[in-house]
């Protein structure tokens, strides 16, 4: 999980989710794309 100031989709498999006021990018196929904002 990378922590970034701005999160973007890196592929079509990425899903953007809001949990507890934070924005996450989650990818089940390629877990290297997982990111969290802030």
Swiss-Prot record:
One GO BP annotation of this record: translation
Family annotation (Pfam families): Ribosomal_L36
PANTHER family in the cross-refs: RIBOSOMAL PROTEIN
InterPro entries per the UniProt record, alphabetical: Ribosomal_bL36, Ribosomal_bL36_sp, Ribosomal_LSU_bL36
Record key words, sorted: Ribonucleoprotein, Ribosomal protein
Protein name, as recorded: Large ribosomal subunit protein bL36
UniProt similarity note: Belongs to the bacterial ribosomal protein bL36 family.
Listed PROSITE patterns: RIBOSOMAL_L36 (PS00828)
One Gene Ontology CC term in the entry: ribosome
Organism superkingdom: Bacteria
Keyword flag rRNA processing: no
GO MF annotation list: structural constituent of ribosome
């Amino acid at each position: 999980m990378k922590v970034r100031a701005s999160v973007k989709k890196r592929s079509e498999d990425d899903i953007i989710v809001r949990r507890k006021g934070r924005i996450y990018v989650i990818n089940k196929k390629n877990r290297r794309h997982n990111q969290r904002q802030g």
